[in-house]
């Protein structure tokens, strides 16, 4: 799916997916929105920060994680790329008691320090060439492990047979 049009939601800036470093503008991709929701007045919820959690610390490129343009289709012919361009998160799971958030973000699994929830910091990221699309992130009960799942291995079209190519 694409980013909303600025005509639909003010402030949306859609950037083209590219392998060149993106370091200017304010594209809606390559960030998350941190939203504060007062429990006593949820109607006053507001975006309090928009951290660029995919940024390459060495270059400052917003698109600093897996940055591969779509590749070959799955042998079934479905339009899924085994080389996603990491520009959004599909699923994030917070474990506030230990100050961590795990994200399944298209081509990467990420771990964020949320001890300061308004200003999360990426601690680490992983990539697995056998994952087509990082789908979900779940902590174990004590928060010492994160389990990531792949869209192809679950969701609406599981592909877990030996004959299925990664």
Model-derived features: positions:
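Feature marking well-ordered beta-strand scaffolds used for ligand recognition
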Residues: 1-166
